Amino acid sequence: MAGTVRTACLLVAMLLGLGCLGQAQPPPPPDATCHQVRSFFQRLQPGLKWVPETPVPGSDLQVCLPKGPTCCSRKMEEKYQLTARLNMEQLLQSASMELKFLIIQNAAVFQEAFEIVVRHAKNYTNAMFKNNYPSLTPQAFEFVGEFFTDVSLYILGSDINVDDMVNELFDSLFPVIYTQMMNPGLPESVLDINECLRGARRDLKVFGSFPKLIMTQVSKSLQVTRIFLQALNLGIEVINTTDHLKFSKDCGRMLTRMWYCSYCQGLMMVKPCGGYCNVVMQGCMAGVVEIDKYWREYILSLEELVNGMYRIYDMENVLLGLFSTIHDSIQYVQKNGGKLTTTIGKLCAHSQQRQYRSAYYPEDLFIDKKVLKVARVEHEETLSSRRRELIQKLKSFISFYSALPGYICSHSPVAENDTLCWNGQELVERYSQKAARNGMKNQFNLHELKMKGPEPVVSQIIDKLKHINQLLRTMSVPKGKVVDKSLDEEGLESGDCGDDEDECIGSSGDGMMKVKNQLRFLAELAYDLDVDDAPGNKQHGNQKDNEITTSHSVGNMPSPLKILISVAIYVACFFSWCTDLPCPCLCCPAAPCGPPT
């Protein structure tokens, strides 16, 4: 009997023990066959041979360190790291797409627009010679063409001295003026005095102070224009550099842990914690964020430069009014023609000896200090307004680099409220670690992210930003300092134009001249007067007549001539002379053509 009781007790104990053991066993893994992981990995990276069919210990893993059986292999881990870095590069490029397009578009627009301004300035000058000094053509056309070619090259960065450009123009013009206008009847035997005349031009100051005035205006406006273009091109380089950064292995491991290690546990639908994403991104992009300080300074310095680009610091105003100043300089020569002819006749006639260098300069050769006058002009949508619009758009990106980590996290799948999310190791109810800020100066408590200095390419781009910022500050015009005192003393009246006006160019002749700025930006329209189609160039061939007469003003033509240019990059140039200038050639083809005399 006692044996039977003991046997029964043992049976009961065994049953209870089995029950307890059953309760102590851990729950089975979410995907005991790794089927979901295999399906996902196949879509991400073809290669099912690397995915285990059932969970494995994963002792060889280095990033997705398992707390139990895992559906990841070492080869899968490597593929995840590669994919994570590629994803990061794509997110970074997506973040900068709008900014990059903004700068590229405007750099192309302004470069083309500056070329259009130069081309029109050349046309105006040629037309002025044709209508006022026909005896000087075509020699004058050649000299004017060479001058404006040098202007274009200078804007694009060529190492050309502006003073030399202007001196060469007047050195070349004076022999033609002297032999064709002042002494048209000179015999052939004395026409070989060009070198003597070129030298006499400077020593006798036959054009008065107009060459110096042009040097000052052209030099200041072109220097600012060139640095403006250089700054835009550097902005493109900065964006391109950060767009194509190669992230470190440490960063790749952290990105993999954040985006893909949850898959190894079969947690396919779990999102990374938002706070965890911020920490990882600030660590990965610590070097990039170091650009922020210099990027902010770049935009603010560019704004300061743009704010000073008016009057003599605006190449649009200076070049489009250059024909008027050249016209005035020739009038000055004519006004003093008698005395100049006498003096130069003694120095250069029948002689190649350079005795003129010690010649007496008559004191009564003078410059009329009120020859140049300035008038208000009608406001148009000019290069100046376009520049200001660009600056306003750029300022919306002034925090671009400091905001990059947050931007990328906001554009990738994360749990924004940090609840039921992946913290890099496991699924948690709430993530509590605070994201670090301010680039590399903070430690992240993430041993995987080793704090190093910026990548060499980032250091190089920072150095370039420092350099361009220094140039921008150097070239920026202090507020209120627009016209040099020396210019006022030489006859440039500056009182007629306010600081906010876009157009201030010289007059021609004795009276005030109201000039409408010729260059406008239109959304989809482009009207461009070709160099050879300048109103004064008809003597070069009647074959251009049809092209000239088909050009109309806005007021007279039913619909403007439309020229579609490359996507999102447009340059529009439009002429409307009818109401303001004596020569309404574009509005009234029958009228004499050319700018005012």
UniProtKB/Swiss-Prot annotation:
Membrane topology per record: Lipid-anchor; GPI-anchor
GO molecular function: peptidyl-dipeptidase inhibitor activity
Signal peptide interval: 1-24
This protein's record includes keyword Plastid: no
Single GO cellular component term: cell surface
Phosphoserine PTM positions: 351
Pyrrolidone carboxylic acid sites (modified residues): 25
Keyword terms: Cell membrane, Disulfide bond, Glycoprotein, GPI-anchor, Heparan sulfate, Lipoprotein, Membrane, Phosphoprotein, Protease inhibitor, Proteoglycan, Pyrrolidone carboxylic acid, Signal
Residue numbers spanned by region Disordered: 533-553
Annotated S-S bridges: 34-71, 64-261, 72-264, 196-348, 251-284, 273-421, 277-409
GO biological process, one term: negative regulation of epithelial cell proliferation
InterPro entries per record: Glypican, Glypican_CS
Cellular compartments annotated: Cell membrane
Matching PROSITE patterns: GLYPICAN
Glycosylation sites: 123, 240, 417, 494, 508
Coiled coil: none
Main location: membrane
Maturation and modification: O-glycosylated; contains heparan sulfate and/or chondroitin sulfate.
Homology family: Belongs to the glypican family.
Function: Cell surface proteoglycan. Negatively regulates the hedgehog signaling pathway when attached via the GPI-anchor to the cell surface by competing with the hedgehog receptor PTC1 for binding to hedgehog proteins. Binding to the hedgehog protein SHH triggers internalization of the complex by endocytosis and its subsequent lysosomal degradation. Positively regulates the canonical Wnt signaling pathway by binding to the Wnt receptor Frizzled and stimulating the binding of the Frizzled receptor to Wnt ligands. Positively regulates the non-canonical Wnt signaling pathway.
Self-association state and partner proteins as the record states: Heterodimer; disulfide-linked. Cleavage by a furin-like convertase results in production of alpha and beta chains which form a disulfide-linked heterodimer. Interacts with DPP4. Interacts with FGF2. Interacts with WNT5A. Also interacts with WNT3A and WNT7B. Interacts with hedgehog protein SHH; the heparan sulfate chains are not required for the interaction. Also interacts with hedgehog protein IHH. Interacts with CD81. Interacts with Wnt receptors FZD4, FZD7 and FZD8; the heparan sulfate chains are required for the interaction.
Protein name from the UniProt record: Glypican-3
